[in-house]
């Protein structure tokens, strides 16, 4: 992973519940990786960023009345992120998975455009380690 990625920037967005901006931040870096790495979308770092982006978009969707999209992306994130446990590139994965595992069962019986089942939306903060 590029050490120039400023996880502190991502944590500020994540911890402020600004998941739309988190998705954009991750998407920009994912796009760069798939264009510059020989494995493209199969690159492990790219897959890691994609899994985080799926989680962020799920959290964004559930708060913006798109429960079907939130469930789909939560499932995608849960399929991708466990392989990066416990820590990948300095980011702790378990807190993200815990929020996804709490949210997903609550989405199952909701109407597509229902309110977020968690009022207020409670999520684990992004935890990262400073890499030297």
Residue ranges and their predicted role:
Residues 42-48, 86-110:
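TPR/TPR-like alpha-solenoid helical repeat scaffolds
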Residues 107-132:
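A hydrophobic membrane-anchoring alpha-helix module
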